[in-house]
């Protein structure tokens, strides 16, 4: 529920089992809640707002002002949600519920131990947010991804850009030869 206080604090991007999180939880966790308030200006709302997650282990449900922004499954892949329509000028609440039952054999657990003490690995279990999270404000149209492909034989580089939104785009091609 929006505005509900949580029982503790955690340093993100460290999982609650990590000493650096300030929690250092040693038992199994089925899931963990995160909540943060952010202030957004009218000017920032003129474009798009994209909420990025470096990684959350394993299933993340993301809420903005009590509304579901999206869900993501997978503990190692980055993901993002366009939260523009869910934000308002002023204070906004972002909440994340991360679910990761390491004892469920249907959920990939990597090298995490199913036993209380680590067995077969030298690190703690990982539940929840364990990579950086950031809220990015962009124009309505923006380049979300750029990739470069090189061909050593031909000496060519191909660049592809992924554009989000509608905009007039001019493509320019340059050729540079080295002898």
Can you describe what each PLM-predicted range is?
Residues 60-62, 171-174:
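Short beta-strand elements bearing conserved aromatic residues within extracellular beta-rich modules
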Residues 25, 29-142, 166:
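Accessory beta-strand-rich segments of carbohydrate-active enzymes
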Residues 1-9:
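Predominantly extracellular/luminal regions of secreted and cell-surface proteins
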